[in-house]
Amino acid sequence: GRERVKNDKNTFGEIIYRPVDRRQNFVKRAVGLPGETLKIVNDTIYIDGKPVAFPENVQFNYIAAMNGPLTDDIIKRLEITASDVETMSLNEFDRANLATWIPGAKDATHFYALPLTAKMITELTDAGMLKGYIKTNTLLPPGTQGSYLFPDGLADSWSLSNYGGDNGILIPAKGMTIKLDRDSWLTYQRAIRNYEGHTDSYFKDGHVYIDGKPADTYTFAMDYYFMMGDNRDFSQDSRFWGFVPEDHVVGTP
């Protein structure tokens, strides 16, 4: 495990730590602030139980049924990244099956998987091109995404669109004290060990140990944030990483 890597330098070499200010930067939206409880229900973010309006440029990935091709000019005008547009080749059976999910798909001539904003959907509909559409995530079997999401071990039944379980997820704040048990350890262990420096901390035999000693509570030393990208279905963000500590926030675009 980690201790062997640290102690067996002949096999694994010296451990090189990567300073915070030399890590790759990501541009994400801080959707949850320190001390807030976040939950996602059918793509809508709830903060402390209240829904948050979608940003104007938020995108979701759709399967879109069109009555004509998406030309390079249309893609450029809509400001869609061309590499994000996937042309779907469907046989007659696949098309009939998709028509059960997308009204109008039976009469469509072209099918695409692509990210769209609400404004893009309106423009394509008003232009008479868009016959119908459906969010790609709704076609995935339940549990498909959960094993990849944070926190590992608690999110198996969650998805990108429905995240946080029944009670949501509490974002740590400086000075906030939590009760330590299995679930809270799974949620906050990365913050405690990796960001706040308590590397000799673990869960064993039903108890949490901080710095090698049994502990019932933990008080955070830093503020944390929950970050999400506006391309909601294709964003690597806090739904995968977990909380972002204050010293990892380097600025605003």
List where the protein language model places each region.
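Soluble "head" domains of membrane/secretory-pathway proteins
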Residues: 1-253
